[in-house]
Amino acid sequence: MRLRNFYSALALSAAVFAGPLYAAAPAMAAGTISGGFDVGPGGFQGNFNPLAATGGFTWLVTYFEPLVIYDDKLENIVGDLAKSFEISPDQLTYTFKLAHAKWHDGEPFTSKDAKFTFDLARNGKTGSVFAARLASIASVETPDEKTVVIKLKEPSPSMLDTLTKVMMLPEHALASIPPEQLAKNAWWSSTPIGTGPFKFNKYVADQYVELTANPDYRGGRPQVDKLINRYFADPAAAIAALRSGEIQFTYVDSNDVSTFSSDSAFRVIEGDSFVVNYVGFNQEVPLWKDLKVRQAFMHAINRDAIIQSLYGGAAKPANCVYVADRLVPKAIDAYAYDPQKARQLLDEAGWDKINGSKPITILTYYNSPLVANVLAAMQAMLAQVGINIVPRTVDTPTYNSIVYKQGGTADEFPLIFAGLQNGPDPSSINIGLNEKQIPPAGSNIMRIRMPAVTKALDAALAETNPAKRDARYQDVCKATNANLPWGTMWVANRYGVASSKLENFIWTPAPAGGPYQAHPEKWSILE
């Protein structure tokens, strides 16, 4: 395509997204840290229920806690509410010894709470996103108040990774709520109690959440009195609030980094996102049934140009669902930019009769100027080969209500531009591609039913030999590259910017916000 058309599209999109929207600011007290902890990919989830959360764990883990958690490097899984754990040699029994902890209302945390939580998480009626992922659990036993034993039906090498996201919940506070009424119960945003270093104080709808220090936290009283999470409809407003000192942290896009990197008042934090961005082809829409159409889509997009021009080179092209060298075999199709080949494939598939130039909505929850520019670039490139996409951006709650809806109309989202976690454990990608994970069981929102992909994923999930595991996930890479359930685009770096006034502040650009050991009880701020 012509560069003039490409950059014209980018300029138009940037102009459309130029106006910031500001969230109301709460009064700042001494010893308060305020941040846009849910600014960025995924945005504000619209609820505080960790069983239903697909993101936002950076914030949720400040007051809820799991049994086990990743360290802040996302390299090892360590104990959190479990002071220790062990796995039997046959990998069928997981034994957790619990730490001495209290709920925020003073009641003790016991093994009964852990069993209660896992029973909820395994019950699809609760709206849990973990039901399918925990299906290999045969039983949860509580031999005493400080011991939890999970027994599996078959080995599950990804089980610990899943458990890092299952936040413990209080039986005494939730047992009276019927499972089918739990997902959207007012408790989550009014009087939730956890075991973490901060306690829920109040939520001002769509503006902010305020937490207060938990004086009885087992790791010691937090260094600050309050922790506030501000919500911003526009990332530009969060950046303005950071510069003015209203908040001390926010996520930023790669094209904003240069404005902070040379300013000593701020610290830029960079890391691998472990999220593959992709164009999802809704398999219940006839448009995408022919593989040649999906192949044409890939050849029509100049991913290298987008990465260099818009991401500033801070992304790696993805030719399958992974980019890590150990998981990507040689000799897979790179789907090089080739608009002539794209037109040829569309002609062979009979695209003029399938759809022709009719507009096709591409739905996304990414609301940043960067992604607006990315979609404008894609739109211009695809138009050159005869595919007419029209971007539609909505907030995360609206997006989820559309793509997870049962019995909905597939034409509402024939295409999506989204991202899904593909690490640190490569099994994370399973929930978006395995046919067993089609909603309500999981997050296969494109309703993908591709036997070769499911077979490769199942084999990888079942592999218990660490030496063979990477090879199994290379097979997943091959299957997704050959069958194109998604049009995989890239894995980009992520960035956060923190005020230099923050001390002992830990933020890791983790997929879905973690969780990981951030130790918010140690965060402090220079007055």
Curated annotation (Swiss-Prot):
GO molecular function, one term: peptide transmembrane transporter activity
Alphabetical list of SUPFAM superfamilies matching this protein: Periplasmic binding protein-like II
UniProt keywords, alphabetically: Peptide transport, Periplasm, Protein transport, Signal, Transport
Signal peptide: 1-23
Subcellular locations according to the entry: Periplasm
Pfam family, one: SBP_bac_5
Any GO BP: protein transport
Broad class of the protein's primary localization: periplasm
InterPro entries from the UniProt entry: Peptide/Ni-bd (IPR030678), SBP_5 (IPR039424), SBP_5_dom (IPR000914)
GO cellular component, as recorded: ATP-binding cassette (ABC) transporter complex; outer membrane-bounded periplasmic space
Keyword Protein transport applies: yes
Function: Probably part of an ABC transporter complex that could be involved in peptide import.
Subunit structure, as described in the record: The complex is composed of two ATP-binding proteins (BMEII0863 and BMEII0864), two transmembrane proteins (BMEII0860 and BMEII0861) and a solute-binding protein (BMEII0859).
Family that this chain belongs to: Belongs to the bacterial solute-binding protein 5 family.
Listed name of the protein: Putative ABC transporter peptide-binding protein BMEII0859
